[in-house]
């Protein structure tokens, strides 16, 4: 999980979602997991 000031999709399978007021990127590739913070 990377914590970054701005989250971006890295590949086509990345999905940007909001959970509990946080912006997350979830993906099949675990290296692409990101959280905004």
Swiss-Prot record:
GO molecular function: structural constituent of ribosome
Cross-referenced InterPro entries: Ribosomal_bL36 (IPR000473), Ribosomal_bL36_sp (IPR035977)
A cellular-component GO term for this protein: ribonucleoprotein complex
SUPFAM superfamilies: Ribosomal protein L36 (SSF57840)
Entry's Gene Ontology BP terms: translation
Keywords recorded for this protein, A-Z: Ribonucleoprotein, Ribosomal protein
Keyword field contains Iron: no
Similarity remark: Belongs to the bacterial ribosomal protein bL36 family.
Protein name (Swiss-Prot/TrEMBL): Large ribosomal subunit protein bL36B
Organism: Saccharopolyspora erythraea (strain ATCC 11635 / DSM 40517 / JCM 4748 / NBRC 13426 / NCIMB 8594 / NRRL 2338)
Species lineage: Bacteria, Bacillati, Actinomycetota, Actinomycetes, Pseudonocardiales
